[in-house]
Design a protein with these regions (language model features):
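Conserved non-catalytic scaffold segment of RNase H-like nuclease domains
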Residues: 3-31, 36-126, 130-131, 135-139, ...
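Short, glycine/acidic-enriched loop or turn micro-motifs at the edges of active sites
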Residues: 37-39, 146, 189
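Active-site catalytic pocket residues across diverse enzymes, especially alpha/beta-hydrolases
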Residues: 129-132, 197, 201
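Short alpha-helix plus adjacent loop in nuclease-associated cores
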Residues: 142-159
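Acidic, divalent-metal-coordinating active-site segment for phosphoryl/phosphodiester hydrolysis
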Residues: 182-193
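The feature marks non-catalytic terminal segments
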Residues: 198-211
């Protein structure tokens, strides 16, 4: 969302509790976010879980995470269950989508969103927010795989880089995920990559897969 769009929504939401979302972005604070959904197509996907963790002054606040499970959507089928291992019975106590979004906005505020394939998550959340609340998320996006690629590309132009989250974490000597396709684990992994790449040393350039 550009500055003009942000200003438009800021004035349109006068008197709304959501107006501060479109004010100036907080500096030094970020939120790493991930969603589990029912499809890889953002126009068809429905939310299953949403998880996030704050990054404040380069510290990942894992002691106060955000995590919600939604009611099982109609499109939750065997194909999506194979990916994230979340079944209908696992969502028996899930909350409705609008309530989940309200909780998420209270947690995130207008902080930039960090993530792995974060544009996919943002697209789905935008569609849901427009449907229930009437506006898209204003949050700037930070893609950790792009930061990783750009840092290495400057020193190893035309090399091949494995941009999977597991490969990035392994190369950066970060903890490997125990549960793949777990929203909170993915959010924490993306946060670790972000802090490592923005505040740590340059990653090792001795890559077995460069060419």
């Amino acid at each position: 969302m550009n500055a003009l769009q942000r200003l438009y929504w800021y004035y349109k939401l006068k008197g709304s509790p959501y107006r501060p979302l479109f004010a100036s972005v907080q500096k030094g604070e970020y939120v790493s976010l991930d969603c589990e959904t029912t499809s890889l197509d953002p126009n068809r996907a429905e939310l299953v879980t949403i998880a996030a963790t704050k990054i404040i002054d380069n510290r990942i606040i894992t002691s106060q995470p955000f995590e919600v499970r939604l009611r099982a959507p109609q499109s939750l089928d065997s194909n999506s269950i194979k990916i994230h291992q979340i079944r209908h019975q696992d969502l028996a106590d899930g909350i409705d989508e609008k309530q989940a979004l309200i909780r998420l906005l209270n947690f995130v505020g207008n902080r930039p969103l960090v993530g792995y394939h974060i544009r996919y998550d943002k697209k789905i959340l935008d569609l849901a927010c427009k449907r229930h609340l009437g506006f898209p998320l204003p949050n700037p996006l930070i893609e950790v795989s792009q930061i990783y690629h750009d840092k290495l590309e400057r020193h190893l132009p035309n090399a091949y880089f494995d941009l999977s989250l597991d490969a990035i974490c392994k190369h950066l000597d970060l903890p490997q995920q125990k549960n793949k396709h777990d929203a909170l684990q993915d959010a924490i992994s993306a946060a670790l990559v972000f802090v490592r790449l923005t505040k740590g040393d340059l990653p090792s350039l001795n890559l077995p897969y460069t060419r």
